[in-house]
Design a protein with these regions (language model features):
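Glycine-rich phosphate/oxyanion-binding loops and their immediately adjacent helices
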Residues: 1-4, 9, 64-69, 75-78, ...
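Upstream accessory/linker segments immediately N-terminal to the RecA-like ATPase cores of bacterial MutS
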Residues: 5-6, 10-57
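Generic amphipathic alpha-helical segments used as scaffolds and interaction surfaces in large
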Residues: 10-16, 57-60, 117, 121, ...
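Ordered, soluble secondary-structure elements with a strong preference for glycine-centered loop motifs
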Residues: 11, 64, 287-291
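Amphipathic alpha-helical interaction segments
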Residues: 15, 19-22, 68, 72, ...
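Charged catalytic carboxylate motif
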Residues: 19, 65, 260
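Conserved pre-motif I regulatory segment
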Residues: 41-86
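Inter-lobe coupling/hinge segments of SF2-like helicase ATPases
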Residues: 82-357
Length: 357
């Protein structure tokens, strides 16, 4: 009898293997087919813009990982096929810098570049960061979000058509029909899972040929899953932090240690740091979750009467949410109590602790 059951296990294993093998094979076939169908713009040269930035403007030495990823991107954009690459790296690993340098390659070859972020706050932050990095170089960078209207919007749209605007940064607003480029060659999409494939395709349709696409995410995605989810994307990983960045420590504590936890939070705030407190949506109903957040918020107000506490959750109106976020970003509020809506990424370099209830 034993032999029979062992055979059975092996047969099942074989069938499972075969099924997965064919899934992977199909994905690969799809990717190869895609590469044949979509020709990309060829960026032949590394020119003045890139070189000036590299020699004069780099805020710090690139890490080995950043150099490796840049090389992968340069190979892609010089190959004649359209690049579709997923760039994954922890918060603080320097993805934005790699994205910016890739965009400069497009500029060197006579194309425009565009960066799309999931929220206005994030788009604003990217725009400020990039303008700061390019300060003193003659490159017109513009921000386009839903709240930019009227004459200002018209001026940006005209600038895109004439080719004066070299880099456009924005939210979903950049894929509206009214937005047209003179020659869009490179697109960066931040936090992929907020944008569907259809939305990526809408950016391509703004051109005769599809631009090169770089997708950035801080969410670690296992390679096999990446293939299945984004079968059309090649994956690059930035797996080292810039010098001087401390790795992030994750600690699990039980409820009875709350007092000592709050003590260490106080210490951080006294040192001028800021703190996130996150109530993830675990319960089934949003009502209960909101109640948890509200109770947590009241509790934190009582615990930290000396602090300004702001709160953010998914049920708020966008304007209200932005106002609360601004309090935290500007440093006026020391503590932010939030649901997981903040996961899309806000850059608050001064925040040093995140407590997840």
């Amino acid at each position: 009898g034993l032999v029979g059951s062992e055979m059975c296990i092996r047969d099942r294993y074989r069938l499972k293997f075969e099924e997965l093998f064919y899934v992977q094979l199909n994905i690969l076939r799809y990717a190869k087919d895609r590469q044949r169908r979509y020709r990309g713009y060829i960026f032949e040269k590394v020119g003045d813009v890139f070189n000036t930035f590299y020699t004069k403007k780099l805020p710090f030495q690139l890490t080995g990982a950043q150099k490796r990823v840049l090389k992968e991107i340069r190979n892609d954009v010089g190959s004649g096929r359209q690049m579709n690459r997923l760039l994954q790296g922890d918060v603080g690993s320097g993805k934005t810098l790699v994205a910016l340098m890739s965009m400069l390659l497009a500029l060197d070859n006579g194309y425009q570049a565009c960066m799309m972020a999931p929220t206005e706050i994030l788009a604003n932050q990217h725009c400020e960061t990039i303008k700061e990095l390019l300060f003193g170089m003659d490159i017109r960078v513009e921000l386009l979000t839903g709240s930019i209207k009227g004459k200002r919007r018209e001026a940006i749209l005209t600038g895109l058509l004439t080719g004066d605007v070299k880099i456009l940064i924005g939210t979903h607003a950049v894929i509206e029909d009214t937005v047209n480029f003179s020659s869009l060659g490179f697109v960066v999409i931040d936090e992929q899972h907020r944008f569907g494939v259809a939305q990526r395709a809408r950016l391509w349709s703004k051109n005769i040929q599809p631009p090169h696409v770089l997708v950035m995410t801080a969410t670690p995605i296992p390679r096999t899953l990446a293939m299945t989810l984004y079968g059309d994307l090649d994956v690059s990983v930035i797996d080292e932090l810039p010098p001087g960045r401390k790795p992030i420590a994750t600690v699990h504590q039980f409820d009875n240690r709350r007092e000592s936890l709050y003590r260490s939070v106080r210490k951080q705030i006294e040192e001028g740091r800021q703190v996130y407190i996150v109530y993830p949506l675990i319960k089934e109903s949003e009502k209960i979750d909101l109640k948890n957040l509200e109770e947590g918020y009241q509790h934190i107000l009582e615990e930290f009467p000396e602090c300004t506490v702001c709160k953010v959750h998914g049920k708020m109106k966008a304007a209200e949410k932005d106002e609360q976020m601004q309090l935290f970003i500007s440093g006026k509020a020391q503590i932010m109590v939030a649901t997981t809506v903040i996961e899309v990424g806000v850059n608050v370099p001064n925040a040093s602790v995140m407590i997840i209830e």
